[in-house]
């Protein structure tokens, strides 16, 4: 090899490294490659590589090389390349592997020809590529059209020119046979490929259980931290946790794995391409939750605009896992913990905590969220799974509803008393640890200040900046001042027997009494008045009762607030006003003041935190009652529990003293030992936490130092010993792992100044191990630390019973005789329709269903649903069913649903003769041809949708029925309120929901945090932070139609607490505190949903006088609109739509209209298929659509709804239980087991059907589809036969956005507006997209010969379009900027009398100037003068 060739080879090797081509690929396929030439066109930004490689590359390696070349240099230039092979060995196998790539290069041929070629597998006989065709004409056409483009495509891969030939099959019949055979082979191959894939996946899974996953070579390199990757790298190794992973099949057939990895210093996106078929299951085995080591290069990805790692090797490794290594009998129990249900504060789920505690070997764990118990159901589920005790609790906001106004009560007249109004300024809040620096007072008699006292005291220590800013007192002002003892002595003499008065007296008296006691004077015995509490009683409507707020109310001057003398003087003047107001309420004596304490003042008290743990099942119910009271009766900013209510419902509850916001900790900081002792007596156990949790108190200068904190904690421990109460060490955990800290920080930051935690450094509050907690309390000594961390926490846990937070069975309301009533109702209606005796098929179905329904206690659910539907029907509104209720024939016979699930059949309404088609030959009874009864000649009624009962209540008939009903949107509130009549107001609640932080919202929080802290996160790191913040509780709400019914022999608190949705005390309904899914199997949930269809039907009935139940379901003219618009008297070009289904529910969207264009349905059953196909996932696209397009089967044969599978397989001869199991697996996207496939094949189930089952991810119930289609067909009937009525109902009920100015101008203007919006594409606003649908209907309407008038001041309605001949008069609220309330007010004012002027219109209808201008601009105020004034000449 000469020097030039060696250089070319070295350059090629370097290029492969730059492209991050795996080493094994280079060694096996690209070893002797060279760069022969590189052509660069700078002005066009184009590079062209000419490469030489000795042997032909496998197609997959060619693709890899092409992908990497284009991707790597895409940010610099547009890259192309040509390969020259030394000795191209072009076997038939090579041609066939490259054939999809060759066809993909044929861009200038027709689509049908291209699709025909894609299905070919050409033969190669050494010189010719042979393609099979149907006849000689096709052969000539193929050679003429394809020879030249094919040669160009072939040569672009570096292959020599090849001759193209077409081989004609012997006959058309033989060709068709060949095509059919090829189809069958293709379907078999699909099934085999899927099974082979599953087999490989199972092998990989099995291998991974035995050993860790390795893709590529083992990695021995040391990983670098992700935060150090700031630029492109040729080769680097990283290690971390995968938090997102997905595999995607590329068009080329190769698989791309992308995953996001973090080491908690940063995150990065990793890509890896499969090299061969064996790689694919390995790539698919890479999952979220794995720890991996990755080796590869880092490059700038222009698509994601970020640094991305291209992996060559991936090795699974052991993750870093925290363990609790304390001996089993010496492990702690966490008694204070917050889950993601602590609103915008807790991060980790209850399940994650319980799982971790179980892994660590803890015997129990408590759940104590802020004010709520919404994590209980999840915690309970996890406890059952892991066999660990969960202690159910809450961190409550405790308020004193009995805070005294007066202390040391005395029977002395207020108006005649002498008062000393005083104020102290101090070095801090603690009467124990801080000192008085100023004491000032005024003596008040008969409203006059008769004496003053003002002294500074030298604390002999520097003041903090906070105190200097707050009080204006400086160190210099205090130097040389008297000792505090001297000041207190003088003050003691000054007060004499006067009544002492202070604002927030407990604070000032605390310092005074502490000082007096130290000097041996004893506590002051004087009567005391607290003006703060007196203000709360006298003036409850004030927003707060701070001194400055109260002074402002009475115009009392307050200068230098927070200086003792000025505060005392202002309080003195204030006191006298308050005393006079009190006497007006007949409060004349000091000892009468406390008669009024606590009256409605729960919301004025500052809450203190405490922990409530349910000790017994009775205690849990009491806890639920307290949580309900806190949310319903005592909610003010937060849910609050008055101390008196806690005392009443304390049975079975352990009360703990809580965190630093609890009374005991605050008392130990601020009050005398005697006061703290009194406070602590209220609690069952005392709580202390790691010093880190309290360090913000040092930050805020409320505590001097860490040593002072240690002293407070030690004093609390001693206090517990004195009182004989257990002291426990708790972690106050808000998340699972230390690294989760950032998520909480972002969530707290998102709340801005509204959250006081933003004013402090957040402590590290992860779920701590035993050793971490012991270390945190080491300053107490090893023995004491172990006692509070291990011994006492276990002691508390042992006192608590195993509790069930939700019952373990269904409790339905009891209605006397419900079982018999449902049985009789079902049989009576069945006999009325089918005669007596009933046909065997009818009776068998009824008995089968009634046995399950009555046997499992579900009859009452049917009866309630019947009553609700009957009430709506009696009130004139149809009810549509949804979900699977239409699978129940009993539901049909009790008139809960109109869908009849029996096999398609004829039944005579006169003599009841019937004929059933139970062989699968008919899809829907509505599709049967019209026939007369052979017995009596009466026209048959046609019915039956062939739906198995099992899809509703399960194969054993024991699944709790979920009866969803679509009521008219305008009737829905009446239906809801009817449940109160049926069951009583205290037994019905709206189903509660919990709104969590959504991904989009979390993204905003992360971006905001990044901006506020001047940070730059990689895209993958943003995704990690978003994931960490997603799912945290943000608010609560209510299900749009769900009503929970509590039986009258139970109490809601046997199941859960209650609250108002979003804590809105003005809401009409209370909701369940738990998310309704949590109690779905325990209480009856009625789904009383609001829907437009019944409202439209009611309006059409009112306008036409036609009973919707009499509308035929097989009207041939109506069926035509599903395949074209001709029946409407318009063309596709006129209405810009290829079907007539614009505005028809379920069939008007672009997606479904496209399906209709491709399938041309003409029967009811095919419409049901379309409905099922459009709602499923992977049922239509890449599945049924291909089968129909390829001619494999027709629309009626494909799998559309879940029930089709069971029915079809039973008709094929499979056991019903297996058919049901297969249906359940397929509908949930779980595919098929190999043994089921064998069984299906035994019963001649075709391969295409099996292949279809394997692709499906989710399926729609047929009963739901049938109910929807029934409503759609009725509405379509009016569109065809009563068009102007249809358009009036559509625009009134369904449309929200209008452009009336355009609509009144006719079709040209409407078409231009449609084209304008369509021209914007993705840039069109949501409002414009909504308007587009309305404009499409408006265009169709005017093209059919109808028109719109302008809004008319005297003829328009408020909210309904009016029909006048062939034109519609729009309502006021259809005008832009005119809301419904304004529209109603205009009509109301108009009905009173005519408008004299625009001024009169605005004044009497109370509309805004903007609304008036909109009416005027539209032209409906023509001729109306501006004002009421008349000019006289």
Curated annotation (Swiss-Prot):
Disulfide bonds: none annotated. It is an enzyme of class 2 (transferase). GO terms for molecular function: 3'-5' exonuclease activity; DNA binding; DNA-directed DNA polymerase activity. GO terms for cellular component: cytoplasm. It comes from the Bacteria. Residues 419-575 form the Exonuclease domain. Keywords: Cytoplasm, DNA replication, DNA-directed DNA polymerase, Exonuclease, Hydrolase, Nuclease, Nucleotidyltransferase, Transferase. The keyword Repeat does not apply. GO terms for biological process: DNA-templated DNA replication. It catalyses: DNA(n) + a 2'-deoxyribonucleoside 5'-triphosphate = DNA(n+1) + diphosphate. It is found in: Cytoplasm. SUPFAM superfamilies: Nucleic acid-binding proteins (SSF50249), Ribonuclease H-like (SSF53098). It holds the Pfam family tRNA_anti-codon. CDD domains: DEDDh, PHP_PolIIIA_POLC, polC_OBF. NCBIfam families: dnaq, polC_Gram_pos, PRK00448.1. This is DNA polymerase III PolC-type. The lineage of its organism: Bacteria, Bacillati, Bacillota, Bacilli, Bacillales. The gene is polC.
């Amino acid at each position: 090899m000469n020097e030039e060739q060696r250089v070319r080879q070295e350059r090629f090797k370097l290029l492969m490294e730059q492209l991050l081509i795996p080493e094994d690929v280079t060694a096996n396929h690209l070893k002797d490659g060279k760069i022969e030439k590189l052509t660069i066109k700078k002005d066009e930004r184009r590079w062209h590589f000419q490469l030489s490689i000795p042997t032909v590359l496998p197609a997959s390696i060619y693709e890899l090389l092409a992908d990497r070349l284009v991707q790597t240099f895409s940010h610099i230039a547009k890259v192309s390349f040509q390969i020259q092979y030394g000795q191209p060995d072009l076997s038939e196998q090579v041609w066939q592997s490259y054939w999809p790539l060759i066809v993909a290069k044929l861009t200038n041929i027709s689509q049908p020809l291209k699709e025909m070629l894609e299905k070919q597998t050409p033969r190669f006989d050494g010189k010719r590529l042979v393609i099979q065709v149907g006849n000689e004409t096709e052969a000539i056409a193929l050679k003429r059209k394809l020879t030249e483009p094919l040669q160009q495509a072939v040569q672009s891969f570096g292959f020599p020119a090849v001759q193209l030939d077409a081989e004609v099959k012997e006959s058309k019949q033989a060709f068709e046979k060949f095509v059919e055979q090829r189809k069958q082979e293709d379907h078999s191959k699909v099934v085999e490929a899927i099974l082979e894939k599953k087999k490989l996946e199972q092998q990989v899974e099995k291998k991974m259980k035995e050993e860790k996953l390795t893709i590529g070579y083992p990695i021995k390199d040391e990983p670098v931290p992700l935060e150090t990757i700031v630029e492109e790298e040729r080769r680097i190794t990283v290690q971390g946790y995968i938090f997102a992973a997905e595999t995607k099949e590329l068009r080329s057939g190769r698989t791309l794995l992308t995953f996001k990895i973090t080491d908690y210093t940063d995150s990065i996106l990793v890509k890896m391409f499969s090299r061969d078929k064996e790689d694919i299951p390995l790539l698919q085995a890479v999952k979220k939750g794995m720890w991996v080591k990755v080796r590869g290069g880092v490059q700038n990805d222009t698509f994601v605009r970020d640094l991305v790692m291209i992996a060559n090797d991936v090795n699974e490794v052991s993750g870093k896992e925290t363990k609790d290594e304390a001996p089993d009998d010496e492990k702690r129990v966490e008694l204070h913990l917050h889950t993601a249900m602590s609103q915008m504060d807790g991060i980790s789920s209850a399940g994650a905590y319980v799982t971790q505690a179980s892994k660590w070997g803890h015997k129990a764990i408590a759940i104590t969220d802020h004010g709520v118990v919404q994590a209980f159901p999840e915690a309970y589920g996890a406890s059952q799974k892991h066999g660990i005790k969960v202690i159910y609790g809450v961190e409550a906001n405790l308020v004193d509803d009995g805070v005294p106004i007066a202390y040391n009560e005395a029977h002395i007249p207020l108006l005649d008393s002498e008062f000393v109004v005083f104020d102290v300024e101090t070095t801090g809040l603690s009467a124990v640890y801080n000192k008085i620096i100023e004491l000032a007072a005024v003596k008040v008699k008969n409203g006059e200040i008769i004496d003053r006292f003002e002294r500074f005291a030298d604390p002999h220590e520097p003041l903090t900046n906070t105190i200097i800013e707050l009080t204006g007192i400086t160190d210099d002002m205090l130097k040389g001042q008297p000792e505090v003892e001297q000041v207190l002595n003088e003050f003691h003499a000054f007060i004499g027997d006067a009544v002492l008065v202070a604002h927030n007296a407990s604070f000032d008296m605390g310092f005074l009494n502490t000082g007096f006691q130290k000097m041996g004077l004893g506590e002051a015995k004087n009567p005391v008045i607290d003006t703060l509490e007196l203000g709360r009683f006298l003036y409850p409507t004030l927003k707060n009762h701070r001194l400055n707020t109260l002074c402002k109310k009475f115009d009392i001057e307050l200068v230098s607030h927070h200086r003792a003398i000025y505060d005392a003087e202002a309080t003195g003047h204030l006191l006298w006003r308050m005393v006079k107001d009190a006497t007006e309420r007949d409060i004349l004596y000091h000892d009468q003041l406390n008669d009024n304490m606590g009256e409605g003042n729960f919301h004025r008290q500052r809450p203190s935190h405490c922990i409530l743990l349910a000790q017994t099942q009775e205690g849990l119910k009491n806890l639920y009652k307290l949580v309900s009271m806190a949310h319903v009766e005592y909610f003010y900013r937060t849910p609050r529990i008055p101390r008196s209510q806690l005392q009443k419902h304390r049975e079975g509850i352990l009360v703990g003293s809580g965190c630093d916001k609890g009374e005991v900790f605050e008392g130990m900081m601020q009050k005398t030992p005697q006061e703290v002792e009194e406070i602590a007596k209220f609690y069952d156990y005392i709580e202390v936490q790691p010093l880190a949790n309290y360090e913000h108190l040092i930050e805020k200068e409320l505590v001097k130092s860490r040593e002072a904190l240690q002293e407070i904690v030690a004093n609390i421990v001693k206090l517990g010993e004195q009182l004989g109460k257990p002291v426990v060490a708790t972690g106050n955990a808000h998340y699972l792992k230390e690294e989760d800290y950032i998520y909480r920080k972002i969530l707290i930051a998102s709340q801005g100044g509204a959250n006081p935690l933003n004013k402090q450094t957040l402590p590290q509050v992860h779920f701590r191990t035993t050793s971490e907690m012991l270390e945190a309390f080491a300053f107490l000594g090893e023995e004491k630390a172990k006692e509070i961390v291990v011994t006492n926490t276990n002691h508390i846990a042992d006192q608590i019973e195993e509790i069930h937070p939700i019952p373990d069975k269904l409790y339905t309301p009891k209605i006397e005789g419900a079982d018999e009533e449902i049985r009789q109702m079902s049989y009576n209606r069945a006999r009325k329709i089918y005669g007596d005796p009933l046909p065997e098929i009818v009776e068998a179905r009824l008995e089968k269903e009634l046995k399950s329904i009555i046997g499992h206690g579900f009859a009452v659910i049917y009866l309630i649903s019947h009553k609700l539907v009957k009430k709506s029907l009696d009130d004139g509104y149809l009810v549509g069913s949804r979900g699977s209720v239409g699978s129940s024939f009993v539901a049909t016979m009790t008139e809960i649903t109109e869908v009849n699930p029996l096999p398609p059949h004829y039944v005579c309404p006169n003599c009841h003769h019937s004929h059933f088609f139970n062989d699968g030959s008919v899809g829907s009874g509505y599709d049967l041809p019209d026939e007369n009864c052979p017995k009596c000649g009466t026209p048959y009624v046609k019915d039956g949708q062939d739906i198995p009962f099992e899809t509703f209540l399960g194969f054993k008939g024991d699944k709790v029925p979920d009866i969803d009903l679509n009521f008219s949107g305008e009737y829905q509130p009446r239906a809801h309120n009817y449940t109160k009549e049926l069951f009583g107001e205290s037994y019905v609640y709206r189903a509660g929901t919990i709104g969590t932080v959504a991904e989009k919202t979390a993204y905003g929080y992360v971006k905001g945090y990044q901006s506020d802290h001047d940070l730059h996160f990689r895209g993958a790191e943003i995704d990690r932070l978003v994931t960490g913040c997603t799912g945290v509780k943000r608010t609560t709400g209510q299900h749009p139609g769900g009503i929970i019914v509590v039986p009258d022999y139970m109490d809601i608190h046997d199941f859960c607490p209650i609250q108002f949705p979003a804590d809105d005390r003005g809401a009409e309904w209370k909701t369940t505190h738990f998310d309704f899914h949590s109690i779905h199997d325990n209480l009856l949930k009625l789904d009383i949903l609001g829907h437009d269809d019944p409202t439209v039907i009611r309006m059409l009935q009112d306008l036409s006088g036609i009973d919707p139940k009499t509308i035929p379901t097989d009207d041939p003219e109506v069926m035509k609109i599903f395949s074209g618009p001709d029946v409407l008297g318009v063309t596709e070009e006129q209405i810009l739509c290829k079907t007539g289904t614009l505005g028809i529910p379920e069939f008007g969207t672009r997606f479904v209209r496209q399906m209709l264009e491709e399938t041309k349905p003409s029967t009811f059953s095919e419409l049901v298929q379309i409905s099922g196909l459009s709602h499923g996932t992977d049922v239509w696209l890449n599945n049924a659509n291909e089968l129909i397009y390829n001619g494999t089967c027709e629309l009626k044969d494909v799998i559309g709804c879940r029930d089709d599978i069971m029915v079809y397989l039973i008709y094929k001869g499979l056991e019903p239980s297996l058919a049901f199991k297969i249906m359940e697996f397929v509908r949930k996207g779980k595919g098929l087991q190999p043994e089921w496939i064998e069984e299906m094949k035994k019963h001649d189930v075709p391969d295409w059907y099996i292949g279809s089952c394997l692709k499906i991810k989710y399926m729609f119930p047929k009963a739901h589809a049938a109910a929807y289609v029934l409503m759609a067909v009725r509405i379509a009937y009016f569109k065809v036969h009563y068009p102007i009525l249809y358009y009036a109902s559509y625009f009134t009920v369904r449309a929200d956005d209008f452009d009336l100015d355009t609509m009144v101008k006719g079709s040209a203007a409407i078409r231009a507006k449609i084209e304008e919006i369509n021209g914007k594409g993705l840039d069109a606003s949501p409002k414009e997209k909504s308007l587009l649908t309305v404009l499409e209907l408006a265009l169709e309407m005017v093209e059919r010969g109808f028109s719109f008038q302008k809004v008319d001041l005297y003829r328009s309605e408020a909210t309904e379009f009016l029909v006048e001949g062939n034109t519609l008069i729009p309502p006021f609220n259809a005008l832009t900027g005119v809301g419904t309330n304004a529209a109603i007010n205009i009509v109301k004012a108009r009905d009173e009398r005519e408008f004299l002027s625009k001024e009169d219109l605005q004044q009497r209808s109370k509309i805004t100037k903007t609304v008036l201008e909109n009416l005027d601009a539209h032209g409906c105020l023509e001729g109306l003068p501006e004002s009421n004034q008349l000019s006289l000449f």
